């Protein structure tokens, strides 16, 4: 998917990074929670048609703007089938099973099941581009002390699901918490202290600490 352009919009009190993924004249919006008019302005500026909304997980700071987005764009909303809501969200969702794919502008987006920070955590792989949500940040990873978090699942997500990805894959996290907004996966293996855990037990201690 080398022809995909990822536009970033920084918003909210927690350094959220929301994305508009462009391929040709089509667009996907990722994790709309803040400043929906500004996200829509990116769409309009580039003459795009929104064809879907991708949610990396179910936390409020990643989904709260979906109803406003849907008022502007009547499109499918994609999220993991394992996402947990309390209370339930008032919208129709396309639940993604493990191994699911999403067609986009003649391409295929791979949905990588990465729970741990939340039950519904997923990453979206677009060739050498990876939308990671709160699974992994630049030089960090998602917290695992929320209700329904599971630090052991987070270890599996990082070291079994994501670890084999090509080193030149560029990660696009859900928050701007690092020295740079994005980075290559290979560089993160060298600089991210959570990814430098020698064993599962070491990682669990680091993330719980």
List each model region and its residues:
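Short Gly/Pro-enriched turn/cap motifs at secondary-structure boundaries
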Residues: 9-10, 93-94, 113-115
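Histidine-centered catalytic micro-motifs
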Residues: 53-63, 112-121, 172-178
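Metallo-beta-lactamase
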Residues: 119-208
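Conserved beta-strand hairpin/beta-sheet module of binuclear metal-dependent hydrolase folds
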Residues: 1-46, 123-133
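Active-site HxH/HxHxD metal-binding segment of metal-dependent hydrolases
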Residues: 15, 27, 34-110, 190-194, ...
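Hydrophobic residues in well-ordered beta-strands that form the structural core
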Residues: 30, 77-79, 132-133, 173
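Core dinuclear metal-dependent hydrolase active-site scaffold
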Residues: 19-22, 99-126
């Amino acid at each position: 998917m080398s022809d995909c352009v990822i536009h970033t919009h920084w918003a909210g009190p927690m350094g959220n990074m929301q994305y508009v993924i462009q391929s040709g004249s089509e667009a996907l919006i990722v994790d709309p929670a803040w400043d929906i008019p500004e996200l829509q302005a990116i769409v309009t500026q580039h003459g795009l048609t929104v064809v879907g909304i991708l949610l990396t997980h179910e936390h409020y700071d990643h989904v709260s703007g979906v109803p406003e987005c849907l008022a502007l764009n009547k499109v499918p909303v994609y999220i993991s089938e394992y996402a947990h809501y309390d209370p339930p969200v008032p919208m129709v969702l396309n639940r993604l099973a493990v191994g699911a794919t999403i067609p986009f502008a003649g391409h295929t987006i791979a949905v990588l099941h990465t729970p741990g920070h939340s039950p519904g955590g997923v990453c979206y792989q677009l060739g050498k581009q990876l939308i990671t949500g709160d699974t992994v940040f630049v030089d960090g990873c998602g917290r695992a002390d929320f209700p329904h978090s599971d630090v052991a699942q987070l270890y599996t997500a990082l070291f079994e699901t994501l670890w084999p990805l090509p080193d030149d894959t560029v990660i696009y996290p859900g928050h701007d918490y690092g020295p740079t907004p994005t980075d290559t996966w290979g560089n993160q293996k060298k600089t991210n202290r959570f990814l430098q855990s020698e064993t599962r037990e070491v990682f669990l201690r680091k993330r719980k600490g």
